[in-house]
Amino acid sequence: MAACVPEKQTVPTVPPELRKLNGRQYQLESSSAALMPLILQGTTNNFGANISKISMEFSPGECRLIVEDGAETNLIVAGMDGTPRKGCVTLNGEIYAVGSTARLTTDEDDRPVLKVFICFTETPSVRIMKFILYSPERMLIRFDELPSVEASLEVLFSLVGGRREPEQPE
């Protein structure tokens, strides 16, 4: 009779690159990005303030972002284990359900990059925040969204007035 040995389970840990950022707060020098994706702001007529400050906290399997924009502060809890964490964000007094994940990767220059995906679960919109880590004191944040503004406008134009043909140079 063969002995049945349980699989060894790995316990999630906080990656060393992120431990250096634990508890840090970052003031954004100049930002034109809001927590809510632009296309969602337009469809809900709820235009949020620009993000001014972000704090980061990490625990095994989770990333916590405290995002300040205008008068509101939102806590985003993102699963780093592949499982989204459910939560809510408040923008101009309106509450939106979100599910968030995060993962640590590297860019083409081998710098650590923390990607956070904030899915607005009642819509098709996703805010993507890429934190490119230069040092514990300095990082670049890139904001993206799905669907992209370009793709959303293309769909809108096709619904409203037919498909637009690209302009031909004269």
Functional labels for PLM-detected ranges:
Residues 1-95, 106, 119-138, 142-158, ...:
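Catalytic loop of the DD-peptidase/beta-lactamase superfamily, centered on the K-T-G motif
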Residues 98:
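Residues that flank catalytic or metal-binding motifs in active/ligand-binding sites
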